[in-house]
A protein has these predicted regions:
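Cytosolic, long alpha-helical scaffolding segments
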Residues: 1-235
């Protein structure tokens, strides 16, 4: 049975505004991640400081979206597809806020590094972060286009992110062995790598929500995972 569209024009505008804010928030997260990765791979402190400063914008969007959802549910009492729209927006904004926090943490640790990174380690970070950046862009496009197939592609790519993360971890461990007097930098790099992977995990969370939004049901089966991670991360 086809779900009947709502008829209140102002309500439709409110939903459009909610969707627009999700896309804007996602855009800020994309920008933060890009700057954070550039900061650590090129030791660009200006980019790192910009990510830390601009995280407040992402936090404000989460608060705004949360208030919009509360108002929509309380005043409009949405049903069916409209209820999925509002609930999904709330969950996606939560994941985006965490992605912003993780980008900020990468930037904070970048500012604490004492030495320039060897090329092999920079290359490993770029490989995994490049895939995560593509993943984030793809899922925002999937949300915008209401594409369940794009959401599935992002969901399935999580395994590759895990594997690239562990390759990066191996490079960090090699760096630690070669720089035993610089355990501080090595520790920061382990957490940077794990935070990049966690951004991928939260992007995959968004993929599950987009699929639910479009299909009205959750993805079946266990989330694809790569090899076991070496260390745990942080928010």
């Amino acid at each position: 049975m086809t779900e009947a569209p709502h008829t209140v024009k102002s309500y439709e505008e409110e939903l459009k505004n909610l969707n627009s804010n999700i896309i804007k928030m996602g855009g800020f997260c994309e920008e933060a991640l890009g700057k954070a990765i550039q900061a650590i791979t090129t030791r660009n402190s200006d980019n790192a400081e910009a990510v830390i400063k601009d995280d407040e914008k992402i936090d404000k969007f989460e608060t705004l979206i949360e208030q919009q959802v509360v108002n929509l549910i309380a005043l409009r009492q949405p049903m069916a597809i409209d209820l999925r729209e509002t609930v999904t927006a709330l969950k996606i904004s939560s994941d985006l806020e965490i992605i912003g926090d993780l980008a900020k943490n990468i930037s904070k640790r970048t500012l604490l590094l004492n030495e320039n990174l060897p090329k092999n380690l920079v290359d490993a970070i770029i490989r995994v972060s490049s895939d995560v950046q593509k993943q984030l862009k793809s899922i925002l496009d999937a949300y915008l286009e209401r594409s369940s197939s794009m959401a599935i592609n992002v969901w399935e790519s999580d395994e590759q992110i895990d594997d690239l993360t562990n390759l990066c971890m191996q490079e960090v461990i090699r760096y630690l062995k070669d720089n035993e007097n610089n355990l501080s930098d090595g520790t920061h790099l382990l957490f940077v790598t794990k935070n990049i992977e966690r951004i991928g995990d939260h992007t995959t969370n968004i993929a599950e929500q987009v699929y639910y939004l479009v299909k009205g049901e959750y993805l079946e089966g266990d989330r694809p995972k790569g090899t076991e991670p070496i260390v745990t991360g942080e928010k």
